[in-house]
Amino acid sequence: MAQRTRLGDLLRPLNSEYGKVVPGWGTTPVMGIFMALFLVFLLIILQLYNKSLILEGINVNWNGLGLG
């Protein structure tokens, strides 16, 4: 049997809705927006790494990170 702890007692209310499903889409659109923003962030990092996105006055040197 599981041991009861103070931390478990504090976190129990967060798990009280386990197994319940709210009808409809819920927060799915919000998740989709954040996934799209994360994709844009990753694409910008990739373009900076490939030097296909050039920012004036900013020198990008990846050698210090051991990446290049």
From Swiss-Prot:
Residues that span the membrane, as ranges: 29-49
Main location: membrane
Taxonomy, superkingdom: Bacteria
Keyword tags: Membrane, Photosynthesis, Photosystem II, Thylakoid, Transmembrane, Transmembrane helix
Protein location: Cellular thylakoid membrane
Alphabetized GO MF terms: phosphate ion binding
Topology versus the membrane: Single-pass membrane protein
Gene Ontology terms: biological process: photosynthesis; protein stabilization
GO cellular component term of the entry, any: plasma membrane-derived thylakoid membrane
Keyword field contains Metal-binding: no
Record text on subunit structure and interactions: PSII is composed of 1 copy each of membrane proteins PsbA, PsbB, PsbC, PsbD, PsbE, PsbF, PsbH, PsbI, PsbJ, PsbK, PsbL, PsbM, PsbT, PsbX, PsbY, PsbZ, Psb30/Ycf12, peripheral proteins PsbO, CyanoQ (PsbQ), PsbU, PsbV and a large number of cofactors. It forms dimeric complexes.
Physiological role: One of the components of the core complex of photosystem II (PSII), required for its stability and/or assembly. PSII is a light-driven water:plastoquinone oxidoreductase that uses light energy to abstract electrons from H(2)O, generating O(2) and a proton gradient subsequently used for ATP formation. It consists of a core antenna complex that captures photons, and an electron transfer chain that converts photonic excitation into a charge separation.
Assigned protein family: Belongs to the PsbH family.
NCBIfam families recorded: PRK02624.1
Protein name as annotated: Photosystem II reaction center protein H
